[in-house]
Amino acid sequence: MAETLEEWISDSNQVLNLQMVRTPEDASLLQYEEQQNIDVFNPAFTYPIFGDNEKIFGYKGLDIKLHFASGSLRQYLDISYDAKLASSTTPPDEIEGALYKFIPPDYTKSEVEFQKRVAGDAETFKPLGEKIGSYAHPSAGRKGKGQGDSGMAAGKAIEDNEDVVEYEMYKATWSTPGFREYHRRMQIFVLLFIEGGSYVHEDEDAWEFIVLYERRTRPDSGIFTYHFVGYVSVYPFWCYPDRVRLRLSQFVILPPYQHQGHGSKLYNMLFRHMLDRSEVAELTIEDPAEAFEDLRDRNDLRFLVKEGIVKDPMLYVDVGKGKRGSRVEWELAIRRKYKIAQRQFDRLLEMLLFRQLDKGNPDKVKAYRLHVKARLYRFNYEMLSQMTVEERKEALAKTYESVVEDYKRILGMTFG
């Protein structure tokens, strides 16, 4: 019987099919390499919706379509299957009821109605909030690199250039008209693509969001259409005596847009926006996933190199001699200037030191090793203080080797 019931179990990550839908006219403007923007994709996680095992019981040939109008994010739900188990003792799981708890109730189950919404919203939807930045990428299939932030200065030239696609970022809060309702449509991506992700509380007024869109121009009409790419949410916490600490809580780039540099653009916009705000003391990250931590490291490293940190003689002063004197003052001044959290700042300096390290000089290598171990000891003091001297030495040695290997990996990704 167990073997028979197994046939009625579906992997919820595989049967939940997501799609960002455009009008046929807008879809036809995409080049071959851009078709992934409208292809079906699957979630990374569904346990918040369908349980820890991420299984759905009671169906064969199950197909759950959750489609979104690519800009407005209005939703269409369709549940189909080849067979449904008829059993009173082990009834099939209630699929729509499970999803209903996590999406706004105004979704439609009519494909015709959904296509009408897509068509109407394509012409009327405009991003909510204040535009705070933009950048341009070549259309897929075109050779060359994106124009990066220089695209912001190009103005009308970008709008008239069919070879590039512009991406725009908008800042919004709960007080932005219409954004609360819009957020209820986009927050499902947090559950589906961030492990341990959860919805934010709407009664917490201070939440801030930056939403990233792809902007297209219809060639004949000149109408701009906007297509959701991802977003980041941050929350300000009081920081003594009269400033705030911004905590990055959620960061999502949809799979069709991943590995194209959009995550870095969104992160760097947040970083610059934070630097421009005098009331912000630093940016912290809440339980970052490894992929996001790598993205953060790469961009923070590039930023510090661009700012000339490796050319500053103070970076190399008193390495391996402990935290003291002028080096402490220099580190504090630089960290406060760039508003980077302490542990992250320490790691960044260690990576830059390792990159510049003369690895053929035993004295320099030893000084660097002592420098890193001293930081590791401070960071893990409670655990290490309970060990014997030999155990502590062994633990620090293993941790140091692991840290250095990770630094090599990150530096390789960042600088080649």
UniProtKB/Swiss-Prot annotation:
Gene Ontology CC terms, in alphabetical order: chromosome, telomeric region; cytoplasm; nucleus
GO annotation terms (biological process): DNA repair; subtelomeric heterochromatin formation
UniProt KW DNA damage keyword: yes
Keyword Nucleus assigned: yes
Entry keywords, A to Z: Acyltransferase, Chromatin regulator, Cytoplasm, DNA damage, DNA repair, Nucleus, Transferase
EC number(s) reported in the record: 2.3.1.48
Subcellular location: Cytoplasm; Nucleus
Catalytic activity of the protein: L-lysyl-[protein] + acetyl-CoA = N(6)-acetyl-L-lysyl-[protein] + CoA + H(+)
Matches recorded under InterPro entries: Acyl_CoA_acyltransferase, GNAT_dom, Hat1_N, Hat1_N_sf, Hist_AcTrfase_B-typ_cat-su, Hist_AcTrfase_HAT1_C
List of residues binding acetyl-CoA: F251, V252, I253, Q258, H259, Q260, G261, H262, G263, S264
Enzyme class, broadest EC rank: transferase
Site label Interaction with histone H4 N-terminus, positions: W207
Region (Interaction with histone H4 N-terminus): 52-54, 235-237
SUPFAM superfamilies registered for this protein in UniProt: Acyl-CoA N-acyltransferases (Nat)
GO MF term set: histone binding; histone H4 acetyltransferase activity
Active-site positions on this chain: E286
Subunit structure as annotated in this protein's UniProt entry: Component of the HAT-B complex composed of at least HAT1 and HAT2. The HAT-B complex binds to histone H4 tail.
Function: Catalytic component of the histone acetylase B (HAT-B) complex. Acetylates 'Lys-12' of histone H4 which is required for telomeric silencing. Has intrinsic substrate specificity that modifies lysine in recognition sequence GXGKXG. Involved in DNA double-strand break repair.
Family listed: Belongs to the HAT1 family.
Protein name: Histone acetyltransferase type B catalytic subunit
Organism: Cryptococcus neoformans var. neoformans serotype D (strain JEC21 / ATCC MYA-565)
Lineage of the species this protein comes from: Eukaryota, Fungi, Dikarya, Basidiomycota, Agaricomycotina
Primary gene name: HAT1
